[in-house]
Structure formats: C-alpha cells, structure tokens
C-alpha cells in the first residue's frame, strides 16, 4: 500500500491508478481528472490512506513479532520492509504536494540506518516496538480493524455488510 501511495504519479503517467475512488469521492476528487499534485481534497484522501497503511504496518509488526527470535533472517526481511514503509509514509505526509516518487523516496542513509537498527534489535521485541514508534511518529492512524473488500465483491455488497466506506479498496486502470 505504501508503494501505491508513493508511486501514484508514475502509475498515473502510464495510465494506471490503484487508489480507491470511493474514498476520494468523499473528498470531492475524481481520480480520472486529477491534476499533478492533486490539490487539497486529494491530499486529504492521501492522509486518510496513510492512516490506513500505518494501521496495516502495525498489524504487520505484531505478526512479525510472533515469529520466533531465532528466525533472524525472516524477521530481518520483514523488519526492513516495515521500517522503510513507515519512513516512506512520513515522507509522503511531510510533502503532500509531491508529484514524483523520487520526491518522497527514503534516503540511502535512512535505509542503512533502518537496516542497522533492525539487525541490532532483531531478537528484542520491546526494542523493535520502540524503533517502530519512532519511525511512525506523527503518522495518522486509522482506528479499529481495517477490513478490505475481497476481490470480486462489488462495493454495494460490501457496504451492505456494514463495512466502513472509508476502508473500501479498489484499483485498476483509468
């Protein structure tokens, strides 16, 4: 989800959009006619999606910490991705009018620091939680569970089950 947010403008340039139109409609945004930078409504929708992505990252951290500490390789793989995703979400939040993924790309030094810290703390769940809190500091956070509409289930059927409208996902080409 983080890469979808980061790469929104590159995807758009090649004729693809993976953002949920249902969510952006609430902000008065038609993704098919979106100008570069998107404007205020688009940025508000992106902030909401950052909150949802942040919630997913927290769930992924909980899952990762269920992996035994002796399984250093798989933990490290997951932790690097989680740390970089959190830092990328912060960059997107800090630069809401970005028009290219390169403008919100995590620096090489931040990548190296994320890897070093994750490697150091890989077996220490409490330290990993503190590191994640630092990486995710200031990010909005969607509340509660974040259900996703299963593939093949139309939005109307999903809404009928009383799933929160702001949490519906969609995608595809524009």
Which functions belong to the PLM regions below?
Residues 1-13:
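Acidic (Asp/Glu-rich) catalytic motifs at the cytosolic membrane interface
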Residues 10-174:
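Catalytic cores of Mg2+-dependent Asp-rich isoprenoid enzymes
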